[in-house]
Amino acid sequence: MSYENLANLIFPNIDKTPEYYFEKYPKRDLKEGAKVLRYAPSPTGFQHIGGVFASLINERLAHQSGGIFYLRIEDTDQKREVEGAIDDTIKTMHNFGMDFDEGITGENSEKGAYAPYKQSQRADIYRAFVKDLLRKGLAYPCFMTSEELEALREKQIAEKLTPGCYGEFAKYRDLSPEEAIKRIEAGESYVIRMKSPGNPEKRVVAHDMIKGEVSFPENLQDVVIIKGDGLPTYHFAHAIDDTLMRTTHVIRGEEWLSSLPIHLQMFEVLGVEAPKYAHIPTIMKMDGSSKRKLSKRKDPESAVSYYSEKGYPSQSVIEYLLNIINSAFEEWRAENPDADYHDYKVELDKMSKSGALFDLVKLNDVSKDVICKMKPEVVYDLYTNWAKEYDKEMYDLVTSKEAMMKEVFNIDKEGPKPRKDFAKWDEVREKIFYFFDELFDKETANDVELPKTLELEEAKRIIEAYEKAYNFNTDKDTWFSDLKEVAVELGYATDRKKYKKNPEEYKGMVSDVAGAVRAALTHRANTPDLYTIMQIMGEEAVRERFKKFLSL
């Protein structure tokens, strides 16, 4: 009866039992094989790419199995909570194509039958389970002060012992309920610890869905399950929440792998089945010749805001992350160039066991592939949405010429080898600025990129001759024939074999003449198809550009 008295003293207002909550949150009625997974961040900051990576794995595994993907907020450390972090999480995941079937929907809203989905609102649930453990003598109040714990830790380290509260060092583990009651009634502060049933001679062996079989010594620590503020520790909240929310698989960062013995032991003490576990590799990057963890402090690309500011389409980031999750995705994408990425089946056992390498060069390659497949109308919409927030001048210019810009975004896109000009929207300005006099006219002669074989004065002689022969109203073949005629008149070869045989007889190739025209119209040496650019610009604009070039 003493354990009962102790439990009632600590939790006088808790009248629910674990059985009540098991009935309230029954097993989910899902088809066989359907997985229930969650994204469970702490609202202590804004989202980073590692969070998107983890969330994408959970979302894909849930939805490709016909299961449930939910959002739980782990806000038991309320001192570190950042205002707006929850809304940022929801918005970020939505922007990256991940919507939650249930869970938190806003700072103060949620949906789903397994609510509440905020840990800070589940305090009575945790207390009911702790009260039950106290009744059974499986948990106890610990009155050790922070000073005592620090002194114990220093002593253990000095004696080369594992630090912590366990075995002979668990000072209050065997305190009688009567003595504990006296201390509580005297006003002493305490936390509640779970009595570890661990055996120092035994190991716990578990199957990790990424790493395979893992083995650890059994947990011996009497871990804290309720802190001094009455809220649970991460360990205990995880065990209760994932049990009651009927989570089937816990996918989390490998930094939690060392906690697995604690968590498996908690499920055992609670008398419930543990979920399956997978510990995903830490995202790494190359730093010189070595790898290191992607850093929030050192690496701007660790922040989700980086991808918005640079203008990566969300699909590009998703497809790149799928490449990291399963290297086979790249081959699948090559074989299924037009398929929706949702059609690809993520498989944990094919995931790299070591650190996932994050490579911006590879991301850019993936993003170019994604953008080049987009319809011009889609590119226009996505680009203007980005420019409205990050490049107001370009937004005003592009939206003032919507029809023209859709033509621009379609240049060289319909052939067997479509151009891949952009990896992200902040590259668009430099690639299309010459369609706008407002930007083009800011350039000087120093900005003009000529073919290496041409000086500016020779390029001007070419433009003087070509301007007279130029006819806007011709098809592409006729246009090129006219260009070649001008080239021949000026002493340029139109046959590469003849030029290579006797280069001294020519000033250069017809490509140099085309390069001069390109430079006059765009100031750039590398652009999409020149004829198409001229047709989009229109005759008046082309002739005006020739005039400006001759005046440089």
UniProtKB/Swiss-Prot annotation:
Keywords per UniProt: Aminoacyl-tRNA synthetase, ATP-binding, Cytoplasm, Ligase, Nucleotide-binding, Protein biosynthesis
Position of sequence motif 'KMSKS' region: 293-297
Enzyme class: ligase
Motif ('HIGH' region): 41-51
Protein name: Glutamate--tRNA ligase
EC number from the UniProt entry: 6.1.1.17
The keyword Heme belongs to this UniProt entry's keyword annotation: no
Family annotation (Pfam families): Anticodon_2, tRNA-synt_1c
Encoding gene, per UniProt annotation: gltX
Reaction catalysed by this enzyme: tRNA(Glu) + L-glutamate + ATP = L-glutamyl-tRNA(Glu) + AMP + diphosphate
Source organism: Clostridium perfringens (strain ATCC 13124 / DSM 756 / JCM 1290 / NCIMB 6125 / NCTC 8237 / Type A)
Function: Catalyzes the attachment of glutamate to tRNA(Glu) in a two-step reaction: glutamate is first activated by ATP to form Glu-AMP and then transferred to the acceptor end of tRNA(Glu).
Subunit and interaction comment: Monomer.
Subcellular location(s) per record: Cytoplasm
Gene Ontology terms describing biological process: glutamyl-tRNA aminoacylation
Any one GO MF annotation of this record: ATP binding
Entry's family note: Belongs to the class-I aminoacyl-tRNA synthetase family. Glutamate--tRNA ligase type 1 subfamily.
Binding positions (ATP): K296
GO cellular component, one term: cytosol
